[in-house]
């Protein structure tokens, strides 16, 4: 996507702050990518990964601001209970449902990892930079959506 196209884009970043430091690293990567693309953005914060899809749905349905796309940022670290599977699966499924059923361009940067070491390796901008990757994915999906037209019809 060219910078001229990106300059006209406005993106909403929805970040879960359950792990503050990891969230900061993911956000830094996402913001850096959007700034390099010269896209504008807003940021909202939610308590955890399960709340991210709801925030995106609220913004899409009720916001007076139009967002071309969304970046979902958060981290789910496996614990001793089944809660990890619920949060990891349901947050991802809800984002996919928004993409498929509401035709939203979403970059998914919700980390699902075994431990904090894996989370840091994926969150840091100088390592795997998954926040930046999620922002880039959102920009790519926005471009694809625009290529096929804002109104997508399924045959």
Swiss-Prot record:
GO terms, biological process: riboflavin biosynthetic process
Binding site residues for (2S)-2-hydroxy-3-oxobutyl phosphate: 80-81, 122
Protein name: 6,7-dimethyl-8-ribityllumazine synthase
Enzyme class, first EC level, given as a word: transferase
EC numbers on record: 2.5.1.78
One example GO MF annotation: 6,7-dimethyl-8-ribityllumazine synthase activity
Family: Belongs to the DMRL synthase family.
Xref: Gene3D superfamilies: Lumazine/riboflavin synthase
Protein source organism: Bartonella henselae (strain ATCC 49882 / DSM 28221 / CCUG 30454 / Houston 1)
Annotated catalysed reactions: (2S)-2-hydroxy-3-oxobutyl phosphate + 5-amino-6-(D-ribitylamino)uracil = 6,7-dimethyl-8-(1-D-ribityl)lumazine + phosphate + 2 H2O + H(+)
Pathway: Cofactor biosynthesis; riboflavin biosynthesis; riboflavin from 2-hydroxy-3-oxobutyl phosphate and 5-amino-6-(D-ribitylamino)uracil: step 1/2
GO CC annotation: cytosol; riboflavin synthase complex
Gene (UniProt): ribH
